[in-house]
């Protein structure tokens, strides 16, 4: 019987693959995402899909905004995926395909086709193919990262709708119902995601203001020294 990999195994693999130090604020983001992905990778009910991949890629991109040096982000993402047995290129490609497919749909078209929930209604749209497959599956392991993938798709199909709490929650409710997912948990996960994005944006603003103040101070000091 194969030994089940532990979180420590994944962390060790990660830091073997990405050897440069990670800023403390961002290290927490990376490690929390790694733990979440690890726990799913060893869960027998979990099955990778492109919407989940989009959630992973989006979470990484949004919460790693402002990371310096910027060139390190690719190495960090690669190590993150590989540490849980994933292929970073597959994650990126699947996420890109989901975004491209989302651009071909409106939120109304997405819901209409999902509610019909037949393979024939999906056409060649990969989002519909993926989601209708999930709707028709005998069981599906819901994840927070899948919910973020759905949110990212909705942001592409109808960004204005997401700004309206009532409309956003109604659409999420309908999607959860069609896909047989826990609606209340999905709503809470997305509320927390939105809240964390706002906090991250505020933190980035504070960091940028501090950097500007430091640059200004150095410039003034340089003038005085001359």
Swiss-Prot record:
Keyword Coiled coil: yes
A single GO cellular-component term on record: plasma membrane-derived thylakoid photosystem II
Highest taxon listed in the record's lineage: Bacteria
Position of the signal peptide: none
Keywords associated with the record: Coiled coil
GO biological process: photosystem II assembly
Pfam families in the record: ThylakoidFormat
Record InterPro entries: Thf1
Coiled-coil ranges per UniProt: 183-213
Family assignment from sequence similarity: Belongs to the THF1 family.
Function: May be involved in photosynthetic membrane biogenesis.
HAMAP family found in the cross-reference section: Thf1
Stated name of the protein: Protein Thf1
Organism of origin: Gloeothece citriformis (strain PCC 7424) (Cyanothece sp. (strain PCC 7424))
Gene name linked to the record: thf1
């Amino acid at each position: 019987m194969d030994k089940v990999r532990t979180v420590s195994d994944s962390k060790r693999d990660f830091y073997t693959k990405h050897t440069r130090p990670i800023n403390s604020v961002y290290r927490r983001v990376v490690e929390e995402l790694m733990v979440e992905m690890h726990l799913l990778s060893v869960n027998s009910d979990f099955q990778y899909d492109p919407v989940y991949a989009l959630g992973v890629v989006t979470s990484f991109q949004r919460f790693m905004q402002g990371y310096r040096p910027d060139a390190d982000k690719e190495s960090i993402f690669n190590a993150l995926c590989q540490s849980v047995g994933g292929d970073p290129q597959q994650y990126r490609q699947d996420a890109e395909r989901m975004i491209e497919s989302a651009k071909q749909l409106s939120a109304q078209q997405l819901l209409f086709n999902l509610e019909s929930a037949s393979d024939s209604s999906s056409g060649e749209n990969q989002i519909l193919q993926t989601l209708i497959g999930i709707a028709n599956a005998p069981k599906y392991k819901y994840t927070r990262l899948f919910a973020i993938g759905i949110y990212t798709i909705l942001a592409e199909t109808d960004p204005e709708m997401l700004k309206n709490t009532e409309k956003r929650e109604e659409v999420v409710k309908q999607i959860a119902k069609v896909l047989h997912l826990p609606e209340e948990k999905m709503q809470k996960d997305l509320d927390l995601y939105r809240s964390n994005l706002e906090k991250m944006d505020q933190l980035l603003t504070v960091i940028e203001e501090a950097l500007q103040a430091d640059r200004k101070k150095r410039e003034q000091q340089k003038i005085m020294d001359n």
